[in-house]
Amino acid sequence: MPSCSPQQASKAEENGSNSFMHSMVPQLEWQMETTQSLVDSYVAIVNKTVWDLMVGLTPKTIMHLMINNNKEFIFSELLANLYLHGDKNMLMEESAEQAQRS
């Protein structure tokens, strides 16, 4: 069995660990790329969700409130006032323009 000096043994260990690390580099790079891709996707989802909540949802909410308020006004006050102050027969008559179309 050949004997080797401690320096040679340490060099052999370094070479062995270097070859081990060299074989691990592609796997580590793949893991880093995968992790980076997952983080990018997560950040994009969070940004879209925040945008939808802050910017995208506000106009929708305003339109919803406006439409609901108008609908409530029409059903509660407008129709009641029309029936109260107007001639019901006149309200139900077909306009001349509509009669010509028929």
Curated annotation (Swiss-Prot):
Classification via InterPro entries: Dynamin, GED, GED_dom
A GO molecular-function descriptor: GTPase activity
Gene3D superfamilies linked to this entry: Dynamin, middle domain
Pfam family, any one: GED
Domain GED stretches: 32-102
PANTHER family (alphabetical): DYNAMIN (PTHR11566), DYNAMIN-1 (PTHR11566:SF32)
Descriptive protein name: Putative GED domain-containing protein DNM1P34
Organism whose genome encodes this protein: Homo sapiens (Human)
Gene: DNM1P34
